[in-house]
Amino acid sequence: MEDIILLGLGGHAHSVTDSIEQTGKYNIIGFLDTEEMLGKHFRDYCVLGTDDALGKYFDKGIKNAFVTIGFLGKGNIRNQLYKQLKNIGYLVPDIIDGSAVVSENAELGDGVFVGKNAVINANAKIGEMCIINTGAIVEHDCTIGKFSHIAVGSVICGGVSVGEQTMIGANATVIQEKEIGSHCVIGAGTIVSKNIQDNVIRYGKIEKRTGFEVDWNE
């Protein structure tokens, strides 16, 4: 069993911890978070320090790390932490819950989380650091851009393309062959039956431009 350290102790971390414990592949050393969280516990795990301690733990021989901060809208903290981990030399594995179904013909980038009872079907391509959350379905031949979040119970029908850092809300449905741009938010329960441009918020039939983009070079 390999050691792993987790970044961020919030609600999403609870789900990821469950999946790691279930698979039995990694031994969780603890969490890193903000100074305000130092010493706090979740189950048997403690917040050991801030992300400034990443180098120290890497030097101690811990080579695996995972970002357990959830999707933060227009923020790019997940992106920044991922880059920090890779610059130090950490491996950022995929965490796939034992109840999830992932096709052998699907492609997953680094740091993908696949939650309980989620499905990723044949020829789907999932970008680095995506979250495919509890009960979500990503059907055949879909492409999900890096740092995107397919939320609880949402359905991405066959051949759909989703851009980078886009949030597909809980129980939303994207009809087959549609394209959704980058930096979008699709509200919970929304049915997407037409293409969506970059930087759009869509709730039901209401759509507006967000006016923000994420600078991936920050």
Sequence positions of predicted segments:
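Glycine-rich adenosine-cofactor-binding loop
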Residues: 2-20
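Residues at the starts of beta-strands that form the adenosine-phosphate
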Residues: 3, 27-29, 64, 91
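Structural signal for interior beta-strand "rungs" in well-ordered beta-sheet cores
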Residues: 94-210
